[in-house]
């Protein structure tokens, strides 16, 4: 596969997208939504082939769940596409305007980034999310999904390209690297003549490889070792409901809860309640020594490294901490910087938690599952960034733009 040609075509498409108005971009998104509905059987059939191949390859149930794109999930994707249509287009927005003493009218204007390269694993709905948000913001994209969903992704991109053609936009606005040759990832990372930003969505190994080998700015994130700290003042019954939601609702995603820290003053009372509440849901508690002593055979003793793991299943790490300080030190040591929260009725402690926990999303008395583009009102997201530049947290429309300075004068010359 000639990636250089892909890059050149994407760059050319990005120039046209950059000057395409909101009405036409929204028409393209509606065409994509209609095409996804019209091609549902074809898409679901391709996904079933991917699922069957995954089963034959011995993939875990957690990973197979990530691969799944059935009728229900596809309907959710289509709904997300239409939600993005309703969002304001950030491109062209002018802000920080001012008139300088030298007579220059100066402002910033939001513009597309250009060409976005996204390398991702497993979830085929990511293909739609990235394409839609890129198009809405006037960006072209080059996609490289995992081999596990190759059939689903190829069909999805073909559907998208046909929809783009139907409204008069370049099919090459969204392109897919069909080869599963891993060497092509390294080649893509060197294409700084054509690609303006790389977003790897996958495991720590993929993200490390991209950071170390890319000539292009890389946005990392999506690894979620997420924590909740049950403080001594917590409403225990309400806390149980939040913990269950954060862990059980969808354990295979990056905003699922992986570790619960429990203040020692409530541990004897709270941990048995926790087990009674979660065990019927299939949750296995992985406990450090103090928690294990309280829970006995109702928990499995944690091993070295367990509190650094993104379980992506119904395992939940549990640790008893002496106080607020120990909870913070544990989070600083083991959190991936994705989403962490505190469950408490002491809002002095809650505000202190917000100030000292350095994660992309920090919660008071809420589930970590809220860290999501649609839940944040952003529509779908291309990624959840855990770094501080250029974006942080769910990356929606605004995070897929940059800005340029606009200076307007009346035949001004610099004094």
UniProtKB/Swiss-Prot annotation:
Does this entry carry the keyword Protein biosynthesis? no
Keyword Iron-sulfur listed? The answer is: no
Its catalytic activity?
A: L-glutamate 5-semialdehyde + phosphate + NADP(+) = L-glutamyl 5-phosphate + NADPH + H(+)
Family annotation (PROSITE patterns): PROA
Disulfide bonds listed in the record? none
**Which molecular function terms from Gene Ontology are attached?**
glutamate-5-semialdehyde dehydrogenase activity; NADP binding
Q: Name one GO cellular component term.
A: cytoplasm
Name the Enzyme Commission number(s) assigned to this protein: 1.2.1.41
List where in the cell it is found: Cytoplasm
Which UniProt key words apply to this protein?
Answer: Amino-acid biosynthesis, Cytoplasm, NADP, Oxidoreductase, Proline biosynthesis
The main location class comes to cytoplasm
Pathway it works in? Amino-acid biosynthesis; L-proline biosynthesis; L-glutamate 5-semialdehyde from L-glutamate: step 2/2
What InterPro entries has UniProt attached to this entry?
A: Ald_DH/histidinol_DH, Ald_DH_C, Ald_DH_N, Aldehyde_DH_dom, G-glutamylP_reductase_CS, Glu-5-SA_DH, GPR_dom
Q: Which GO terms describe its biological process?
A: L-proline biosynthetic process
Name the source's superkingdom: Bacteria
Q: What does this protein do?
A: Catalyzes the NADPH-dependent reduction of L-glutamate 5-phosphate into L-glutamate 5-semialdehyde and phosphate. The product spontaneously undergoes cyclization to form 1-pyrroline-5-carboxylate.
Q: Record's NCBIfam families?
A: PRK00197.1, proA
PANTHER family given for it?
DELTA-1-PYRROLINE-5-CARBOXYLATE SYNTHASE, GLUTAMATE SEMIALDEHYDE DEHYDROGENASE
Family listed: Belongs to the gamma-glutamyl phosphate reductase family.
Kindly provide the name given to this protein in its UniProt entry.
Gamma-glutamyl phosphate reductase
